[in-house]
């Protein structure tokens, strides 16, 4: 029947895209890839990292008026599940970068929540910046993404604070899981 022929062609095309003859380090399988070293190591595929970033962007899109504890509760299951799936990964740098990107994104949410420069000044001073440095930072006129990656926000909202708030660190979770297994 025509329906069977159409579905057969769809399956054949899809499998052709997935199937290939190539070196192990040039193709990815189930979200993992391999390094090109003599002793190959498992790594997280670039596409998997991009898909996680897209998923987190979608989750963080509508959190501007929420408490940070609620935001962290919302993204933690995704981060924890992703870390447990990729616990076999042996590459450290992409996971460090991903953790940094998540914190950068959350600092961006906070910067947007503060909205006005006087509020930013008051909150930066409350978080430990000197008045002069907080004033320069709050009134610098740059955008939220730039400010969330700047030194003043890293100083005001360090990794220790995110750990205290309960944010799941992918690298720390993978290290903990690899010690257990």
Segments from the language model and where they lie:
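Residue-level detector of intrinsically disordered, flexible termini
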Residues: 1, 18-21, 44, 90, ...
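A conserved non-catalytic segment of reverse transcriptases
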Residues: 12-74, 78-81
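Non-catalytic, peripheral interaction segments enriched in hydrophobic/basic residues
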Residues: 67, 71-117, 121-125
């Amino acid at each position: 029947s025509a329906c069977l022929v159409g579905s057969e062609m769809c399956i054949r095309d899809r499998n052709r895209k997935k199937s290939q003859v190539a070196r192990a380090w040039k193709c990815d399988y189930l979200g993992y890839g391999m390094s090109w070293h003599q002793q190959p190591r498992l790594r997280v595929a670039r596409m998997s990292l991009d898909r996680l970033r897209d998923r987190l962007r979608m989750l963080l899109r509508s959190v501007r008026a929420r408490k940070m504890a609620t935001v962290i509760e919302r993204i933690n299951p995704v981060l924890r599940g992703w870390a447990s799936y990729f616990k076999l990964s042996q590459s450290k740098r992409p996971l460090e970068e991903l953790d940094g990107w998540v914190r950068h994104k959350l600092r961006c949410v906070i910067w947007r929540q503060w909205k006005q420069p006087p509020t930013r000044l008051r909150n930066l001073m409350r978080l430990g910046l000197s008045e002069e440095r907080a004033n320069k930072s709050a009134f610098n006129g740059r955008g939220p993404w730039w400010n969330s990656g700047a030194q003043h926000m890293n100083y005001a909202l360090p990794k220790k604070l995110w750990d205290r708030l309960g944010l799941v660190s992918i690298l720390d979770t993978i290290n903990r899981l690899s010690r257990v297994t």
